[in-house]
Amino acid sequence: MTNRVVLAYSGGLDTSVAIPYLSKMTGGEVVAVSLDLGQGGEDMESVRQRALDCGAVESIVIDAKDEFAEEYCLPTIKANGMYMKQYPLVSAISRPLIVKHLVQAAKEHGGTHVSHGCTGKGNDQVRFEVGFMDLDPSLEIIAPARDYAWTRDKAIEFAEENNVPIEQSAASPFSIDQNVWGRAIETGFLEDLWNPPTKDLYAYTEDPALGNAPDEVIITFKSGKPVAIDGRPVTMLEAIEELNRRGGAQGVGRLDMVEDRLVGIKSREIYEAPGAIILITAHEAMEDVTIERELARYKRGIDARWSEEVYDGLWFGPLKRSLDAFIESTQEHVTGDIRLVLHAGKVTVNGRRSGSSLYDFNLATYDTGDTFDQTAAKGFVQLHGLSSKIANKRDREAGEN
């Protein structure tokens, strides 16, 4: 049986050269699979044709934008997914979807191997390979950049020696990954933590200091899902795209952080994720109004753990599935409208309304109409502080002795 390698194909230098390289190394054929996740840029038909020109026996392009928005971005919103309380999992949530389609392509096209272009220093090698192991452990995995010390210089040399039809543009000093959920930039001069990011790094967001007029937006949620913007019904994909445009124009969603990678090193990362930041901010505000205090407290811990599981490449794992079930059970009443102002790089919530609200005006007001029974408060305070009072009494007495 002839080996067939199913390659996660981006259209760039490394994966273009990987096609003849993998064919030569395995003595088999290469099937290139590319996903449109709303990353923009080059036309996907050009990407498909380039893979064929480089020697792929088949080149498959999948429009996965809606699937990505509905099945990967939406769960991230419901989980308020932020790794280290900052990063909205831009790349992390795209990898399991790519894995899913590569495994499916291997089944449909007789694949015996799968391949990716990740290095040995990053998180993505883990996300891809654990995903392959979870969905089809029979597939053999090849990672040229990691396993064969594949560098850009080696890729160019191999292309020249083997007449691979690629254009050699000036090498960017940065590593960039993007999709509709956001954009990630790393390496280059950013590796010096003292160097500030330059304006040319950004593509999804304008300079927050431009002074554009504030933009007020109302996001409507139904059971945790954004369903309308300013009263207009939207799909999940449309919601992200519109808020990317509007938030990006205000410089919303820029992040500069030092991230704890799964492989044990710290890495400086720049992110642009206007739509993601706006939607998660609005969703958290909707939860504040509609979820009971103890459940909300507990969910914050679950949200953080969910984000870590996804970041660590365990999208298909049993813990993440169980966390999904818990999170989904909390969303029944997360319904209503959140009004926000987008301006000068900030997202500010300034209005909330919900038919499922737990906010009771008559209990909260300090004015006429207050229905809160303040006479019950004294006894509550005594009981609430009783255990702490007893412990402190003991400690004082112990100190005296």
Curated annotation (Swiss-Prot):
Entry-linked PROSITE patterns: ARGININOSUCCIN_SYN_1, ARGININOSUCCIN_SYN_2
SUPFAM superfamilies (alphabetical): Adenine nucleotide alpha hydrolases-like (SSF52402), Argininosuccinate synthetase, C-terminal domain (SSF69864)
GO molecular function annotation: argininosuccinate synthase activity; ATP binding
Superkingdom assignment: Bacteria
Keyword Amino-acid biosynthesis on entry: yes
Protein's cellular compartments: Cytoplasm
Binding site for L-citrulline: 87, 123, 127, 175, 259, 271
Broad class of the protein's primary localization: cytoplasm
Keyword vocabulary terms for this entry: Amino-acid biosynthesis, Arginine biosynthesis, ATP-binding, Cytoplasm, Ligase, Nucleotide-binding
GO aspect biological process, one term: L-arginine biosynthetic process
Pathway connected to this protein: Amino-acid biosynthesis; L-arginine biosynthesis; L-arginine from L-ornithine and carbamoyl phosphate: step 2/3
Binding residues annotated for ATP, in chain numbering: 8-16, 117
Entry EC no(s): 6.3.4.5
InterPro entries listed in its UniProt record: Arginosuc_syn_C (IPR048268), Arginosuc_syn_N (IPR048267), Arginosuc_synth (IPR001518), Arginosuc_synth_CS (IPR018223), Arginosuc_synth_type_1_subfam (IPR023434), AS_cat/multimer_dom_body (IPR024074), Rossmann-like_a/b/a_fold (IPR014729)
Any single Gene Ontology cellular-component annotation: cytoplasm
Binding site for L-aspartate: 119, 123-124
Reaction equations catalysed: L-citrulline + L-aspartate + ATP = 2-(N(omega)-L-arginino)succinate + AMP + diphosphate + H(+)
Complex formation: Homotetramer.
Entry similarity comment: Belongs to the argininosuccinate synthase family. Type 1 subfamily.
Xref: PANTHER family: ARGININOSUCCINATE SYNTHASE
Entries under NCBIfam families matching the protein: argG (TIGR00032), PRK00509.1 (NF001770)
Entry protein name: Argininosuccinate synthase
